[in-house]
Every structure is written in structure tokens, then in C-alpha cells.
């Protein structure tokens, strides 16, 4: 009996020590936010690429240096989404000057392109005719000329090594390979890179890109001119023309990235959002937020089931009004969209639209007055980064649909975009019986409309508060809006702001798409208000964000694509 009491006594003592230990230890573990860095942070959609950016910053590189090095890596590890055969937009905050600027390096239509070249065919989605003039490398060049600190060639070295020696297929690339399995296995040039024994690679298997490594080495040594007016130019044109394209040497010679010194901006309480204007979707994002800020959202807006259901109904209605107006946007160098953009950025206009939102019900598509129809655009990749000096970059890059044009050069290893598919065509018959948008028709040298919106938010003192953007085609703009709403208005930490289940509505089709883990209170509330909802079998977009936190910079790379941030 005594032995039994002795054992029980010892167990009790051990339990006391365990409980005391947990009380001391838990506050320092479970209470500590994930991925908070005291000095600098880089959030990409691939862990290794975030680490490359961090390493560049620790070497003394600028935030633009880090972004370029990370983007080159992302073009390998998520080659289905972006790469040097595509184009991008940078939004850059320079803490020394206190100014935000945008660099436009989006692809343009070749000079032999014309409005009716596709005639409702699939040629805009794959093959040489779908390839627009790439802008990626010219974009890197201009950004580096303005803000670079380390030598240009240094930024290429990590990706040259990765391409030459190989890297494991990550979650995002594995999903894309599985989705496009048939076309990849039937396309020899693609299968040489992305297959093993004739079957697409699986997650964790090693992929090498030796030809692309050689091309990156040439670009590192010779600069951007090698691509546009140098040793790589003739082969690029040959590859595209042999695949049925119309690109010429002159198209590459004449391509220039554009500096925009006064991007769009909007006041959000004591903060200011900066974002690119058309042909990107900054005006759409601004209209969504302008409509919604009149509701004075706060943590209370999602505190009860009733409030949460109403709040999400209002959000979806704002999406629908904004996407109706998106159909009138196009490249401002070719079409006069100044009045449309003025309206979309006007608080008075947003107030008028907000007054048309009824809290009891949604409405048929015609209620929101869509002028035209715009087809979906494709996937992308996004990076958000902040450096020690408080400078920041939001960069969104794309080759459009998964694996772009499916034209991969067996000489240079470059995978080319299918950005021509982002234009509208007068001969395209859509299922909604809404006319295609003339503002987005093809013209030589024109840029197609895009959903991308790399965003930087500054506080009232001009310091970075949030850097955010997304990939995921037409769902990009709504997902960036939700991340901003979650962070600024609902008070979520950055991880929750990014990971919170999302929903999307672009008016046409007249369906609200929701992720499977979304709160049932939200879907029930939408149903009561006559929304048609569908659960997506996959996910809605992929967001990367960095937010100022008490301990420094809190960073989040969306788990939907398997990314992870890095910093120090």
C-alpha cells in the first residue's frame, strides 16, 4: 500500500513539474507569431526563392536586387507560372526618397498582329501565334538601373546553379504538371524537361534545366541586350516563328520597359494604397475598397454570425460592381480610358454604387451594368519584399496560362508566354451573350488587360505598412482585396489574412466561387440573399504579403502553393 502511495506521489510531483514547465514554455512558442523578422523579409511562392532574396539582402543588396534574384528563381521553381519568356509589373517604394513608382514590363502584341487574327480559335492559347513580346528581362534591367546595388551578374548566380544542378518539384509545379499532363507528355520539348521516362515529374522529383542555365549565364554576362538586341535574339525569333508565330527581330529590338512615377493611390483611413493603373487592375482594386470603406468595417464586422454573413454579402456585391466596370478598361496608350479610371477611383462614384447594394438580396447580372465581356486571364507568380532600410517591392510576373504558349525552346530553354490570349477578340462568342470589350482588342504594340495588382500600403508617416499581391488570373484582384480587408479592417495577423478561406465573384459568370473550408455562416448567408455559390475543387488564388508588426516584419507565403517566406 505504501509503495502504491509512493508511486502516486511521484506521479503527482512529475505532473506538477510538467504543468509548470508548460506554463513557462508555451507563451514563448504557441504565442509567437510565425515568420516575424526583425530587419527584412521576402515572401515568394517557393521557399528556396525567398531564401535567395534574403541572402541577397544580407549581402548588402537592395530590395530590388533581392526581388530580381528571387524572381529568376521563381521562373525555375514555378516555371508553369512565370519566367524570362513572360512579363511583369514592379511596384517599388524607395525609403530614401519616400516615393512609390511602378515599372511596366508587360508583354506587347507583335507589330504584325491584328484585331481579327484569332477568329475564335484556340491559337491564342498555345503555339507561336499566342506569344506576345516578352518584357521580363527589360523590366529587371530598368529596376536594377534605378535601384540596384549589387552587380547584375550576381543576381543570376543562384538560379544558374539551380537550373544546372536541379531542384525538387514543388507543390505548385506538381499541381500544374498533373493538370497539363496530356499536353506535356505529347510535346517533346516540354517532356524533355518535365518528364521522366515519358511521364510528368511528381512532387519531390528532381528537374534540371541545363539549356536555360546557359541562357541565364549569357544574360548575366551580356545584360538584357543579349535578349533584345544581341546573341539570343535571332534564336528567340526563330523558335517562335517555327512554332507558327509572327514575332520579328524588330519586335524585340523595339521593346522598352516603362517607368511610371505617379501610380494610382487611394486613402484607406490613415494609410495610403499604391497600385498600378490600367492595363493592370489597380482601378478595380481601388473601386472595391472605395465601395467597402464606406461600411467602416472593423473586427466587429465579422464578430457574430449575422454580421459576418452580411459583411461577406457586401464584399461580394462590391466585387460584382467593380468587375462590371473592369470590362471598359484597356491599354491607355491605345484607348481613352481616362474617364473610366477617374470614375473607378472616385469616392463619390463609389458612394453611388454602394447605395445600390441592398443588404437583403443580390441581383441579376444586368443590375450591375456590365458594358462588355472579358475572358479570364491566366496564372502568375507574386513576390513581396521589404529591406532593412524600409524600402519595399511588390512584383507580379506571368507567362499567362499554365506553361504559357507550350512553346519551349530546345536551344535556349526559354518557355514563352501566351499573353495574346489576354486580349479580347471581336469574333469571340461567349456563353453570356455579352459583346467582347473593344477597349481590349488587339493592336500592334498594345498591352492586354491583366488582373495583376502588386500593391504597397504606406502609413501616415510614409512608412511601409503592407506589401501584398497575388497570382491566380482573374481571381487575383478579389484575393488582394480580401487580404487587405482582413489585415487592415478585420485586424487579422498576416498569416490569417493570407490563409483565411476566400470567395470570388467576377459577375460573369453569375456565380460566387468559395473555397471548401470557408465558414458555413458565410455560404448560408449568401444563399439566403439569393447568391448562386459553387465550391471550387482547388483554391482561389495565391497571396504573398509582408506586414509591419511589433517585432519587425511579419511575412506570409500562401500555403495553397506551398510557398514559405524568409528573412532575418
From Swiss-Prot:
Instruction: Indicate where this protein resides in the cell.
Output: Cell membrane
GO cellular component terms, A-Z: extracellular space; plasma membrane; vesicle
Q: What happens when the gene is disrupted?
A: Deficient mice have growth retardation, skeletal abnormalities. They are sexually immature, develop cataracts, and have coats with a gray cast. Most die between 10 and 18 weeks. They cannot break down GSH into its constituent amino acids as it passes through the proximal tubules of the kidney. They excrete large amounts of GSH in their urine, leading to a fatal cysteine deficiency.
The UniProt entry, under InterPro entries, shows: GGT_CS, GGT_lsub_C, GGT_peptidase, GGT_ssub, Ntn_hydrolases_N
The biological pathway it contributes to is: Sulfur metabolism; glutathione metabolism; Lipid metabolism; leukotriene D4 biosynthesis
Could you say which residues bind L-glutamate here?
A: 106, 398-400, 419, 422, 450-451, 473
Q: Does the keyword Nucleotidyltransferase apply?
A: no
- Pfam families xrefs: G_glu_transpept
Mind telling me which Gene3D superfamilies this protein's record contains? 1.10.246.130, 3.60.20.40
Membrane-crossing residues?
5-26
Which cysteines link up through disulfide bonds?
49-73, 191-195
Task: Summarize what the UniProt record says about post-translational modification.
Answer: N-glycosylated on both chains. Cleaved by autocatalysis into a large and a small subunit and the autocatalytic cleavage is essential to the functional activation of the enzyme.
Citing just one GO molecular function, the answer is: leukotriene C4 gamma-glutamyl transferase activity
Q: Which UniProt keywords apply?
A: Acyltransferase, Cell membrane, Disulfide bond, Glutathione biosynthesis, Glycoprotein, Hydrolase, Membrane, Protease, Signal-anchor, Transferase, Transmembrane, Transmembrane helix, Zymogen
- How is this protein named in the record? Glutathione hydrolase 1 proenzyme
Amino acid at each position: 500500500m505504501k509503495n502504491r502511495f509512493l508511486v502516486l506521489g511521484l506521479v503527482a510531483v512529475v505532473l506538477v513539474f510538467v504543468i509548470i514547465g508548460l506554463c513557462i514554455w508555451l507563451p514563448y512558442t504557441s504565442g509567437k507569431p510565425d515568420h516575424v523578422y526583425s530587419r527584412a523579409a521576402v515572401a515568394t511562392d517557393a521557399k528556396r526563392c525567398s531564401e535567395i532574396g534574403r541572402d541577397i539582402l544580407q549581402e548588402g543588396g537592395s530590395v530590388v536586387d533581392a526581388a530580381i534574384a528571387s524572381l529568376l528563381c521563381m521562373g525555375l521553381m514555378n516555371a508553369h507560372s512565370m519566367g524570362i519568356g513572360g512579363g511583369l509589373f514592379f511596384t517599388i517604394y524607395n525609403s530614401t526618397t519616400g516615393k512609390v513608382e511602378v515599372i511596366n514590363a508587360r508583354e506587347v502584341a507583335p507589330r504584325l498582329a491584328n484585331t481579327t487574327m484569332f477568329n475564335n480559335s484556340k491559337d491564342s492559347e498555345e503555339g507561336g501565334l499566342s506569344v506576345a513580346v516578352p518584357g521580363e528581362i527589360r523590366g529587371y534591367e530598368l529596376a536594377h538601373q534605378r535601384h540596384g546595388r549589387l552587380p547584375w551578374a550576381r543576381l543570376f548566380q543562384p538560379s544558374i546553379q539551380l537550373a544546372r544542378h536541379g531542384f525538387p518539384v514543388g507543390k505548385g509545379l506538381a499541381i500544374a504538371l498533373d493538370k497539363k499532363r496530356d499536353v506535356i507528355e505529347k510535346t517533346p520539348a516540354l517532356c524533355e524537361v518535365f518528364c521522366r521516362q515519358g511521364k510528368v515529374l511528381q512532387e519531390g522529383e528532381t528537374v534540371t534545366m541545363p539549356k536555360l542555365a546557359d541562357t541565364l549565364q549569357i544574360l548575366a554576362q551580356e545584360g538584357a541586350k543579349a535578349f533584345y538586341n544581341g546573341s539570343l535574339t535571332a534564336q528567340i525569333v526563330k523558335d517562335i516563328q517555327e512554332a507558327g508565330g509572327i514575332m520579328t527581330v524588330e519586335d524585340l529590338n523595339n521593346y522598352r520597359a516603362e517607368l511610371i512615377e505617379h501610380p494610382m493611390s487611394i486613402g484607406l483611413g490613415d494609410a495610403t494604397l499604391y497600385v498600378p493603373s490600367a492595363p493592370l487592375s489597380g482601378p478595380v482594386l481601388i473601386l472595391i475598397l472605395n465601395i467597402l470603406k464606406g461600411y467602416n468595417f472593423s473586427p466587429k464586422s465579422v464578430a457574430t454570425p449575422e454580421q459576418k454573413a452580411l459583411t461577406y454579402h457586401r464584399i461580394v456585391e462590391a466585387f460584382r460592381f467593380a468587375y462590371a466596370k473592369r470590362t471598359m478598361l484597356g491599354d491607355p496608350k491605345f484607348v481613352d480610358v481616362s474617364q473610366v479610371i477617374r470614375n473607378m477611383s472616385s469616392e463619390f462614384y463609389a458612394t453611388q454604387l454602394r447605395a445600390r447594394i441592398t443588404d437583403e438580396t443580390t441581383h441579376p447580372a444586368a443590375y450591375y451594368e456590365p458594358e462588355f465581356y472579358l475572358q479570364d486571364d491566366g496564372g502568375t507568380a507574386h513576390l513581396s519584399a521589404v529591406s532593412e532600410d524600409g524600402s519595399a517591392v511588390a512584383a507580379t510576373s506571368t507567362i499567362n496560362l499554365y506553361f504559357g504558349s507550350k512553346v519551349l525552346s530546345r536551344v535556349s530553354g526559354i518557355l514563352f508566354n501566351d499573353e495574346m490570349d489576354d486580349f479580347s477578340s471581336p469574333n469571340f462568342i461567349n456563353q453570356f451573350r455579352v459583346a467582347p470589350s473593344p477597349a481590349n482588342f488587339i493592336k500592334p504594340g498594345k498591352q492586354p488587360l491583366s488582373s495583376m495588382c502588386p500593391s504597397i500600403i504606406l502609413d501616415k508617416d510614409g512608412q511601409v505598412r503592407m506589401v501584398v499581391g497575388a497570382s491566380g488570373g482573374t481571381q487575383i484582384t478579389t484575393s488582394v482585396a480580401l487580404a487587405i480587408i482582413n489585415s487592415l479592417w478585420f485586424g487579422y495577423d498576416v498569416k490569417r489574412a493570407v490563409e483565411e478561406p476566400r470567395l470570388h465573384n467576377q459577375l460573369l459568370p453569375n456565380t460566387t466561387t468559395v473555397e471548401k473550408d470557408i465558414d458555413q455562416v458565410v455560404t448560408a448567408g449568401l444563399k439566403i440573399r439569393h447568391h448562386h455559390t459553387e465550391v471550387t475543387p482547388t483554391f482561389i488564388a495565391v497571396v504573398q504579403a509582408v506586414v509591419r508588426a511589433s517585432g519587425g516584419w511579419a511575412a506570409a507565403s500562401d500555403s495553397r502553393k506551398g510557398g514559405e517566406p524568409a528573412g532575418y
